[in-house]
Amino acid sequence: MSEYPIDDCFALHVYNDMPAGKINLVSGPRMAGAVCFGVHVIGKSGHGSRPDLAKNPVIPASHIVCELDSALQNQMNAEETLTLSICVQKAGEIWNAIPDEAFFSGTSRYFSRPAGEKVLALIKKTCTNVADVHGCRVEFEPYTKVLMEPVINDQEVVEETAQKLTQMCGPQVLGEHGLWFASETFCKYLNKYPGALGFLGIANPDLGSGAAHHNSRFDVDESALLLGVCAELSFALR
């Protein structure tokens, strides 16, 4: 897009946790950055009756999963808001055989750009060192990286857009909401240009909309989309 003279940018994301007819426009961090990781712990297979003749990768993999929480809790800034989730863990096929390999994967979410690289470094260091203590080694999946930066809204864009929107639709359309721990590719635009992303409420119990995102019952109160159009116009006309 370098051939286009872009001043700033704006986007909306529908949000199940806000009522239809409300929109959230706030400066600063709004959606989380994402570190993703997939870790293979490589050992040496053998019979379950003689663990001393094998190098059981299940043991260090289990320790790593527990130690990652401790590492982040004790080495990250206590004022940083972040989460860590292990979402996959698997190893072995049968009860009496030590496998060659164990695997786990997961994600960490955070709201300041420097935090992502530090979280990633801590994950890699913890995995490598704990595996080494148990005579094993680790291999990381290619997607073990900072996958998304946090969405951080520009104050000037937010204030100007919100002012125009309230002139158009009234102050009652502005709603309050905290941080959203999901991640969003719009961060790539915000890394290049000043801009903002707003949350557009779509929940309406009378229509049955408001189930969580990616839930099979997720639905939208389409009447809320008109407010979204007004917000986009407000950004363009401010």
Predicted ranges, named:
Residues 1-88, 92-99, 184:
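Histidine/acidic-residue-rich, glycine-tolerant segments that coordinate divalent metal ions
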Residues 59-238:
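Metal-dependent amide/peptide-bond hydrolase catalytic core
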